Amino acid sequence: MPTAFPPDSVGLVVPQMAHFSEPLALACGRSLPAYDLIYETYGQLNATASNAVLICHALSGHHHAAGFHSVDERKPGWWDSCIGPGKPIDTNKFFVVSLNNLGGCNGSTGPSSLNPENGKPFGADFPVLTVEDWVHSQARLADLLGIDQWAAVIGGSLGGMQALQWTITYPDRVRHCLAIASAPKLSAQNIAFNEVARQAILTDPEFHGGSFQEAGVIPKRGLMLARMVGHITYLSDDSMGEKFGRGLKSEKLNYDFHSVEFQVESYLRYQGEEFSGRFDANTYLLMTKALDYFDPAANFDDDLAKTFEGATAKFCVMSFTTDWRFSPARSRELVDALMAARKDVCYLEIDAPQGHDAFLIPIPRYLQAFSNYMNRITL
């Protein structure tokens, strides 16, 4: 519990809400007549608005990327190791914007929001979203903030996909793109993992076809299982072996199916329980579908190099050796396409045992490489 914030912290931050009354047309063919986006900012926008950086979050992320909401808050924002004075995304230099995406469950309009047409939660009636839909909504937020062009758009995992989409959809509005632990599209295996997670939610009796809020319940079991499956894919075999091995919770085996016997079982159950108490099931379905649908090359004859021909940004691609969810091979595929499109791109593969979640962890070589690239950005 901090009584004084570290000197490299952005300190206390206050979330802000932006309301948009102009309808937003969506890829699914529907539209949202109006919507809200909750966001936070760190640092100061300079006179020419040339120092703005957009942070795009991953599947379960949100707007609170850095700093603290109160002096009593135990943990800072989810990317606090990378955002702040003297950190890779240096708030002495950059004005940083972090939002909760449309369809989220942390303040932006999403399935748990009230539908103005009937006064009930949207639930399963909330439209299916794509990465491109998010980028369009983010562009409107940029307009509201007076930002014509981002100095950089940065994201890890699903956030990296949004950063890439920015360079395709709004090529003149982003100067640098940093895609970390990401991929140009999901593999069949990744789609399969997402489907298992969705089925865990959809088949939970408490899901009620997505109208669980009206029923006054939560599909806790389904969300818990979905998170447990997902969390396994975010870690590496080495990191799980080092952290848990075959360690037992007690001194002996119980020879039953109900006891939590292994430490790794206890860890996964804790992660699932904690997640199911704070995340919306319909939002989880939306986020995984947006992941599945992301395939920008599909609009360019499946030619990834052609996809980026119109991009004007400079690119930085980073991957982690033990990430098997978005493996280094997928990042190299992206780098090869960018090089074929004659784009300015640098690539770094970090040797790290933490798996996919490594992009969230303050690994010294990763932070140093991140800082080196950001220091090169001129305003």
UniProtKB/Swiss-Prot annotation:
Pathway entry: Amino-acid biosynthesis; L-methionine biosynthesis via de novo pathway; O-succinyl-L-homoserine from L-homoserine: step 1/1
Protein name, as recorded: Homoserine O-succinyltransferase
Predominant location: cytoplasm
Family the entry assigns: Belongs to the AB hydrolase superfamily. MetX family.
Gene3D superfamilies: 1.10.1740.110, alpha/beta hydrolase
Site (Important for acyl-CoA specificity) location in chain: 325
NCBIfam families named in the record: homoserO_Ac_trn, PRK00175.1
Protein source organism: Pseudomonas fluorescens (strain SBW25)
Name of one Pfam family that matches: Abhydrolase_1
Matches recorded under PANTHER family: HOMOSERINE O-ACETYLTRANSFERASE
Sites where the protein binds substrate: 227, 357
Gene Ontology BP annotations: homoserine metabolic process; methionine biosynthetic process
Enzyme class per UniProt: transferase
Domain AB hydrolase-1 positions: 51-360
Active site annotation, chain numbering: 157, 323, 356
Annotated signal sequence range: none
